[in-house]
């Protein structure tokens, strides 16, 4: 190998090594800042009920679900709030210190972002409330659709409750008209 080729090979090797190290550092930094989305059931049992895919204590995560009615506890001397969050299965507790969104209520859907302190306790740094009363986060909707059969026309034998009421009203008004 000539000295010129040797120096080119050395430069190329150092450039590739530098790119590899930079890529590894970027991926490491991104890995620590990624907040994965979980439902309360997935926090307790793991994704797809696989215990190996449970979030670990100390991990930053986002949890989406509904605020359980009757579980909101406010500290009168500070902005600390504790409440339970659930979807279709077990619930987890969420602790948050700060001003809650205006749309935060019991029975409302929220997304809490924070650090998992115990397997069923999330210390939230941010709480986001939904804006539409019919909104359900897509991940939570998919989980709920797996377990709950959606109410639809098929469940009502081809007619809704309103259709049944209208038919009954028409039937009674026709009977009164014949008298």
UniProtKB/Swiss-Prot annotation:
The keyword Chaperone does not apply. Residues 151-179 are annotated as: Disordered. It is a single-pass type II membrane protein. Its main location: membrane. Coiled coil: none annotated. Heme binds at residues 131, 135. It holds the Pfam family CcmE. GO terms for molecular function: heme binding; metal ion binding. Belongs to the CcmE/CycJ family. This is Cytochrome c-type biogenesis protein CcmE. It comes from Pasteurella multocida (strain Pm70). The gene is ccmE.
């Amino acid at each position: 190998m000539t000295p010129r080729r040797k120096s080119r090979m050395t430069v190329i090797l150092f450039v590739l090594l530098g790119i590899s190290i930079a890529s590894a550092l970027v991926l490491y930094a991104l890995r620590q800042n990624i907040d994965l989305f979980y439902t309360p059931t997935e926090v307790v049992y793991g994704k797809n009920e696989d215990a190996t895919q449970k979030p670990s204590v100390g991990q930053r995560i986002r949890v989406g679900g509904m605020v359980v009615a009757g579980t909101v506890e406010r500290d009168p001397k500070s902005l600390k709030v504790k409440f339970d969050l659930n979807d279709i299965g077990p619930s987890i507790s969420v602790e948050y210190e700060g001003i809650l969104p205006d749309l935060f209520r019991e029975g409302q859907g929220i997304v809490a972002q924070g650090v998992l302190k115990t397997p069923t306790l999330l210390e939230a740094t941010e709480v986001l409330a939904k804006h539409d009363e019919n909104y359900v986060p897509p991940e939570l909707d998919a989980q709920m659709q797996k377990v709950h059969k959606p109410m639809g026309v098929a469940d009502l034998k081809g007619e809704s409750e309103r259709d049944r009421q209208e038919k009954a009203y028409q039937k009674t008004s026709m009977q009164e008209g014949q008298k």
